[in-house]
Amino acid sequence: MSTAKSDAAHEATDRQIAALERRIVRLYSTAERGLRERVIAYFKQFEKQDEQKRKQLEAGEITEQEFIQWRLAQIGRGKKFEVLRNKVAEDLTEVTNEAIEQVAAEMPEIYAINYNQEAEAINTDEGSAIPLIMAAAVVLLWHQKSDTMTRPKLNRQKDIAWNSRNFSASVTSNILMNKPLLGKNSICIASITMAVEKSQHSARVNARTFLTNAETRGRQAVYTAAEKLGMHREKTWHTVHDNRVRHQHALMDGITVPATEKFSVDGHDMVGPGDTSAPPYLWYNCRCRMTSKRKKKVVNVSEEQEVV
């Protein structure tokens, strides 16, 4: 188990991620209120028919399966449902796009916080004078060099299709559970809530994913700068010690490599946590971090070697 000293920049990154997640939740809560009105209006069209069918069910005139099949055919399908489903999906994608823009806006600040902490640590260790950086400078750098960090992007058509499937599946699922049509714990409310929660969860995970990328990129930039100035460092991967850490990252805990080289994670080269050049399962929603220290030097003493 790695035992790195306190890491103020990583803690600051975590705080900013938490604050960003709260803003994302508010975005989706606002969107859900508008969507809920539209969904309720759609389901109200079927209120009288649904009551009649339920009375038939209670009277034993139709079976529960026949009642469910009627609901599926009348409520969960057809042109009107497609219009509703598409509107829900498109509106959720708009919210996702806004969330992604907020994530991208936070990344330069995270990059700068982590760059500056590591620069100060190296300057203390090495007696160097690596200059610090401001978030505004990172923004300019990012415009000039697109690979400074991984910019989050939204595939609109893919996201709309995903939201559409989620909403359809939630309506079908709640119909199959034979919930009431309207009301607090109804098909209507549960369906929109489930669709919104899935989209919101994805947006929150994106926040963690890309701010971790910014953290790592800021730190790596300092390590590279130090190496160019003749200061040889090594970096260590640190994982979060809980039951949520993925197996591949648990194996990386405490692994140390030269600061300008890459870690080998499950057979893939990675600059550090959140490196999106690796397959997504190795960086999506990553909570790991990396730190650096002065590289040990080996000097000859007579015929023996001494490590200092």
Predicted regions: what they are:
Residues 198-307:
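Acidic, glycine-rich two-metal-ion catalytic cores of nucleic acid-processing enzymes
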Residues 1-198, 202, 293-308:
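N-terminal leader/targeting and assembly helices and adjacent pre-domain segments
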